[in-house]
Structures are given as C-alpha cells and as structure tokens.
Amino acid sequence: MAGRLWGSPGGTPKGNGSSALLNVSQAAPGAGDGVRPRPSWLAATLASILIFTIVVDIVGNLLVVLSVYRNKKLRNAGNVFVVSLAVADLLVAVYPYPLALASIVNNGWSLSSLHCQLSGFLMGLSVIGSVFSITGIAINRYCCICHSLRYGKLYSGTNSLCYVFLIWTLTLVAIVPNLCVGTLQYDPRIYSCTFTQSVSSAYTIAVVVFHFIVPMLVVVFCYLRIWALVLQVRWKVKPDNKPKLKPQDFRNFVTMFVVFVLFAICWAPLNFIGLVVASDPASMAPRIPEWLFVASYYMAYFNSCLNAIIYGLLNQNFRQEYRKIIVSLCTTKMFFVDSSNHVADRIKRKPSPLIANHNLIKVDSV
C-alpha cells in the first residue's frame, strides 16, 4: 500500500495539483504503509539543522558575493565560478528550505502543489548548478596550473562569463525533464518537495550518473593531475631548476579541493541510495532504513552552508574581507566602496585571491 505523500497521515495539499503528485511509489524507501508519527525531538532536530543551514547559507554566501564585488583582488576569472557556486547555494536558502521548515512546524505540507513544484524545481536547480559549478572550478584550476601558457586566452573575462552562462543553461536543461516525468513530489519523511527516486528507475539512474558521477569523475581527474604535477615538482625536480611553490597559492588550491571533498561526502550517500533503490525497487527499497534516508537528505542540505565557512577558515583574503564587510555594515556609505582601494590595505596585504591568475607551477605540461 502506498504511503500518503502530502504531510502527515491524512494530510492533503491545498489547491488542485496533478494526481501524480499525490502518490508515492510502493518502492519508496521507508514509505511503508503510511507515515508513522514522529517523535518531537526528531522534528526539533531537523528544524534546528534547517534554521542553522538557512542562516549560515544566506549570510555566508552573501559575504562571498560581496567580497568578490568589493575587492578587485578577488575579481578574477576563476572567482566567477566561486560566485556561481554561491548563487547556487543561495537558491535553496531563500525558498525551498524555509518551506521545508514550515512543513516541520505544521507537521505536513500546507501550501498548494504549485509551491511544491516550484520548491522542488529550485532545489534541483541548486543541486545541479552546484555540481556543474564545482566542475567548472576544477577545470579552471587544471587549466591554470597544468596549462598555464594557454590559461589567459582560455579564461579571459568574456570567456569566463560565457562558461558560467553555459553552466546555468545546462543546469536548466537538466532540470526541466523533472517537470515532465513527474518526479518533483512532496516526501513527508524529509518534509520537502524534492526529486522522488522511485517514480522511474531508469530516470533515477540517468540523473545520478550524468548529474553526479560523471561530473565528479571529471573533478577527480583534474585534481589528480594537479596533485601529480605539484608532487612531481616538489620531489622529483632538482633544487636548482625547481620553480617556487608559493605557500599562499598552494593553500588557495587546497581550499577549493576541500570544497569538492565536502560536497562529495555530503551528497554521495543520497546518490548511492538512489542507485541502490533504482537497481531493484521492489526488493531494495524496503531495506533502506528511514533514518538513513532522512540523514542522507539533511546531510546534503547542510552542505549548502559549508563553502562560505571554508573560504573564511582557509583563505586569508576572504576572511579579511568578511571582517571588513561586517564592520562596514555600521557605516552604510562605506559598504559598497571598493575595499582594495585603501592605501593601508595595499601596504599590509599582497595580492592573493582565492583563485588567482598566477600559477602554482610555471610549466605547460600534463
């Protein structure tokens, strides 16, 4: 018997939504014979996670965007992709997450099916946009470090903006089929309107492969080649001919590598569950514990607030710009002033953006 999809048992959405939205497949992991009553501590925990994620996501990613806008040292071709990633993270914090929080408070979905569709659409747009932006960052780093002679031509200001436009065009194209297949549904286990893995096994496998596994393999390839080149230069080249590896540049590269690793860790469990369920829905779905399904989703949700924190912890330029922005909030007229124009700032700090145009290794290899 299919579990009730809208809200708590017996709950129905307001409005006249498509009947496809009102059903959940028997194969949905954890669906069982209905939605079981949730203990109050679980709802409180999920609500706390969402509140923290929303606040840190909005504040942190706005700081990232404003930092790049205010500081000329951070306005470079590589950081265009960082801003793209920040925008992708902001998408979920301003609409889908607040609606999920409202569902937790109300113990069910209380809005129309249109809000559900829009929430699920923005959720997918954010996820795929994040994946493609992280892939764009990795390719940018690979070209900058391993093919430095051609980097300036490949990543001119105009070209970089075109790449970001391509990223979001592909993201939009990738998410539109969800509206046609009917995979954007409300799931009471996670209090969210999101991609439903059990609607179509073939489509779920295609989504996981092309929207997660393939992009992550591209990122892994890029970073492995970068690490190989860095290690080769550091350990196998004679000291006399060894190019200088600037510590600050290396930390900048590590920052983006950490962003990728955390994204992969947070999203891998959910994608793995999707593949397992899609491989044999009838037998595998009932074996997925509900707590694991819920935990994998909220781990993925939590990732949207991590990137801005990583930049602040690992990158001095962003950390200092964060501090300036927070202080300048008290002086409105100074808020949108280019902070890199201050004489004292130019004296105290050397240029060292998160993704700089100067390279770790001045060789054109790999």
Swiss-Prot record:
GO terms for cellular component: plasma membrane; receptor complex. It is found in: Cell membrane. Residues 67-79, 140-158, 225-256, 312-366 are cytoplasmic. InterPro entries: GPCR_Rhodpsn, GPCR_Rhodpsn_7TM, Mel_1A/1B_rcpt, Melatonin_rcpt. SMART domains: 7TM_GPCR_Srsx (SM01381). It comes from the Eukaryota. GO terms for molecular function: hormone binding; melatonin receptor activity. The keyword Mitochondrion does not apply. Glycans are attached at N16, N23. GO terms for biological process: adenylate cyclase-inhibiting G protein-coupled receptor signaling pathway. Residues 1-45, 101-118, 180-203, 278-290 are extracellular. Its main location: membrane. Keywords: Cell membrane, Disulfide bond, G-protein coupled receptor, Glycoprotein, Membrane, Receptor, Transducer, Transmembrane, Transmembrane helix. Disulfide bonds join C116-C193. PROSITE patterns: G_PROTEIN_RECEP_F1_1 (PS00237), G_PROTEIN_RECEP_F1_2 (PS50262). The chain crosses the membrane at residues 46-66, 80-100, 119-139, 159-179, 204-224, 257-277, 291-311. It is a multi-pass membrane protein. High affinity receptor for melatonin. Likely to mediate the reproductive and circadian actions of melatonin. The activity of this receptor is mediated by pertussis toxin sensitive G proteins that inhibit adenylate cyclase activity. Possibly involved in sleep induction, by melatonin activation of the potassium channel KCNMA1/BK and the dissociation of G-beta and G-gamma subunits, thereby decreasing synaptic transmission. Belongs to the G-protein coupled receptor 1 family. This is Melatonin receptor type 1A.
